[in-house]
Every structure is written in structure tokens, then in C-alpha cells.
């Protein structure tokens, strides 16, 4: 009887030494990264001239990047470029036409290292104080526009609503 009492006392004491901490293996869900900025686009034209216009850039990390090019003075959208990991959509608002190309269709045109993740890294890097905020066409993976420049400024990382661009029936698809 005395041995049973000591055994019971030992079990109670060992149970009291149990740790109250629980190990959880849940991985926190990463929130999407939001980034927006104003932009200035300079495209060479003719022998010595160039065209400069403004616009906006919006990025929702891992999902899409939208560039809206605005007409000087009137500030209406004249073109939109929407890039996702799977496709690129370019809309010419002035001439009411658009081009939609899948990643597979662009593999022959773009350099091999042109990836959506690389574009995201460039844009995030440009938003940092020590980052390079002026990018050339070559750095953006568009060798045919290597002399073109995009300057990004007035960055914000506040969350915003961004929906995929819808194209109305008034627009003609360019093959």
C-alpha cells in the first residue's frame, strides 16, 4: 500500500512538470504586396527627338502589374499594359485595338530571362530609397526599346483594389 502511495505521488509530480507550451507548425500566410507609383515614359522618336508622357503603375505582388499611359495635358488614358505571370495585354485606347499574348507566345520574342518575378523585383527595388528608379527598355526585357526610359516616382505601398482589365466590343484584337 505504501508503494502504491509513492508511485501515485511520483506520477502526480511528473505530470506537474509537463510543459504547457504547444508546438504549432502553422506557416503564416503571406499578404500580397501592393505597390503603386507615378511614372514618366520617354520614347525616342526620329533622329534626335523624343516623346515624354506620364502615367501610373500599380502592382499586386504575384498577381499583376498595370501600367496606364496618360495623354499630356488632358490626362486621359491612351494606352494600358497589363502583365500577369501568364499573359500580357496591351490596349491602344486611341485606336480602339488590343493585343493579348500568352507567356508561351512571348517566349520567342522576349529574352530568356524575362520573367514576371524579375519585373516585380525591379519595381520593388526601384521603390526603395537607394533603388534605381529610372529603368531602360533593355533592363525591362524589351531590347527593341533599349533607348526608352521609364522613371518611377511618388511610391506608395498602401493596399488598393485592382481588377483585371475588361475589353469592350468596340475594341479590335490585333492578331
Identify the function of each model-found stretch.
Residues 23-36:
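N-terminal helix-cap/turn-to-beta initiation motif at the start of protein domains
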Residues 59-61, 83, 134-135:
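Generic beta-strand structural signal
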Residues 64-117:
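An acidic-aromatic
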Residues 34-76:
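Post-signal-peptide N-terminal segment of Sec-exported extracytoplasmic proteins
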Residues 135-175:
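Non-transmembrane domains of secretory- and envelope-associated proteins
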Residues 18-21:
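Bacterial signal peptide processing site
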Residues 13-16:
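C-terminal motif of bacterial Sec signal peptides marking the signal peptidase cleavage site
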Residues 2-8:
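Sec-dependent signal peptide recognition
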Amino acid at each position: 500500500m505504501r508503494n502504491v502511495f509513492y508511485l501515485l505521488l511520483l506520477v502526480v509530480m511528473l505530470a506537474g512538470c509537463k510543459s504547457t507550451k504547444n508546438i504549432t507548425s502553422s506557416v503564416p500566410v503571406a499578404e500580397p504586396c501592393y505597390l503603386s507609383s507615378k511614372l514618366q515614359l520617354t520614347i525616342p522618336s526620329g533622329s534626335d527627338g523624343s516623346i515624354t508622357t506620364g502615367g501610373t503603375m500599380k502592382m499586386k505582388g504575384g498577381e499583376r502589374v498595370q501600367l496606364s499611359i496618360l495623354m499630356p495635358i488632358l490626362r486621359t488614358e491612351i494606352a494600358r499594359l497589363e502583365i500577369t505571370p501568364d499573359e500580357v495585354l496591351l490596349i491602344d485606347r486611341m485606336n480602339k485595338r488590343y493585343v493579348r499574348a500568352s507567356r508561351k507566345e512571348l517566349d520567342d520574342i522576349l529574352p530568356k530571362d524575362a520573367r514576371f518575378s524579375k519585373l516585380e523585383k525591379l519595381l520593388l527595388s526601384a521603390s526603395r530609397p537607394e533603388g534605381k528608379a529610372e529603368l531602360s527598355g533593355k533592363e525591362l526585357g524589351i531590347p527593341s526599346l533599349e533607348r526608352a526610359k521609364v522613371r518611377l516616382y511618388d511610391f506608395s505601398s498602401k493596399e488598393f483594389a485592382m481588377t483585371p482589365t475588361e475589353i469592350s466590343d468596340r475594341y479590335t484584337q490585333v492578331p
